[in-house]
From Swiss-Prot:
Residue ranges of every copy of the FAS1 domain listed in the record: 37-181
Compartment(s) of residence: Cell membrane
Residue ranges that the Swiss-Prot or TrEMBL entry lists as coiled coil: none
Keywords, alphabetical: Cell membrane, Glycoprotein, GPI-anchor, Lipoprotein, Membrane, Proteoglycan, Signal
Family designation: Belongs to the fasciclin-like AGP family.
Protein name: Fasciclin-like arabinogalactan protein 9
Amino acid sequence: MATTRLTLAPLLLIAAVLLATKATAQPAAPAPEPAGPINLTAILEKGGQFTTFIHLLNITQVGSQVNIQVNSSSEGMTVFAPTDNAFQNLKPGTLNQLSPDDQVKLILYHVSPKYYSMDDLLSVSNPVRTQASGRDNGVYGLNFTGQTNQINVSTGYVETRISNSLRQQRPLAVYVVDMVLLPGEMFGEHKLSPIAPAPKSKSGGVTDDSGSTKKAASPSDKSGSGEKKVGLGFGLGLIVLCLKFLF
């Protein structure tokens, strides 16, 4: 009996070691796959009310630029996305009158080359730089004001509020705005053509209300008229004297 126990003991020990080894060798749970690259268009499509903005991002290729930069830059990016209603509320012809270059500027004006959280926008130093710039390489900026529950953004030409956030996680923030951000540098009053003054008449005349030009009488004209009257009176006097002598 004792011999049997001694024989089984090593076998039990070996079995325990094998079980422990098998438990240790169990494959670990697979690590979660890394998230794919950030895609601005996909974020906007999920929002469901940005068809016009997506179209403009595509035709200007700004969307592709944002995707490349946001996936490679340490600074991140911030996008202000106008809704379809915002574009519908524009004055008719606003977009059509823009050249292709100005359309690119307009869309770049809705992109900042840095990540800003909502808290950042409340305390940021104005103006906040955007991706748009003028012919003199002057950067177009945005100004932010507000409180915790509401943040307003101003272009110097229009002002609206940030109504929602589609994404607020580094390296990309996407905020919804209720108006298209029209830069003052492109749409401000100083860009309107001034009214041309009425042209002066070359003859020095005076223009009446009907638009016709009346020539002003010059001093020489007045003196010439007086001389004609004097000469005519003198001639009539001579004729009267001659008639008296004859009769």
